[in-house]
A protein has these predicted regions:
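C-terminal region/appendage detector
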Residues: 1-209
Length: 209
């Protein structure tokens, strides 16, 4: 038999009578599936209400920022306050995770490097001849890039750190779906090209090398 892998936690009303479904749990909902759904909700919350500060996070300046409401799948509405600035700030200043009270089970991030520092270091590891092109041709992709103000913040920090004669340009699709799944979209376009068969390596060739 096909067993549903979901659960209901709300009240459903029909004509003439009310059915209270308060906590009906399907016995076959695995812990892994429950964790997957929890992370899916957390990702949506992150991409919906969180945003980067224009410059390095300042606790005093952000305390008066208005909170935003987020509706959970069960209908409950929560207010997200200054945390909506703190969470994305960890991309640039991961060492603040402890002072933000967001540590939990997170690994020690004292020596972790921020996004702009990682980008700068990787560009500087490349040949001098291509660095100018790399600074001027950065593309944001993936779900983590959906934070509002991320592109502007990254571009500003790299501009301050880059050589004075280099133009820094960070681009990102305005379409959230395209940005989130850019790698898959790019892969599908590449795979559809007639010349793609000349680019791949067979299993036999791979094993030979």
């Amino acid at each position: 038999p096909v067993k549903p892998r979901y659960e209901f936690k709300r009240t459903a009303r029909g004509d003439g009578e009310t059915f209270d479904v308060t906590d009906v749990k399907c016995p076959d909902v695995t812990a892994a599936y429950r964790l997957f759904k929890q992370r899916e909700i957390a990702s949506d919350l992150k991409e919906t209400v969180c945003r980067l500060s224009d410059s390095s996070y300042d606790d005093a300046a952000n305390q008066n920022m208005p909170s935003m409401q987020y509706e959970l799948p069960d209908g409950n509405v929560i207010d997200v306050g200054v945390e909506r600035y703190k969470i994305p700030e960890l991309l640039f200043q991961p060492e603040l995770v402890g002072s933000f009270g967001l540590g939990g089970d997170a690994p020690d991030l004292k020596n972790a490097k921020g996004l702009s520092q990682l980008v700068l270091e990787n560009i500087n590891r490349c040949d001098v001849d291509v660095r100018k092109d790399l600074f001027g041709g950065m593309l944001l992709a993936g779900g983590g890039s959906l934070f509002p103000q991320l592109r502007e913040r990254l571009e500003a920090e790299l501009h301050d750190a880059a050589p004075t004669n280099v133009r820094v340009k960070v681009t990102a699709s305005q379409n959230a779906i395209e940005r989130k799944f850019a790698t898959w979209i790019g892969g599908s376009i590449l795979a559809s090209l007639g010349s793609f068969q000349q680019m791949w390596m067979s299993k036999q060739e791979y094993e030979e090398h």
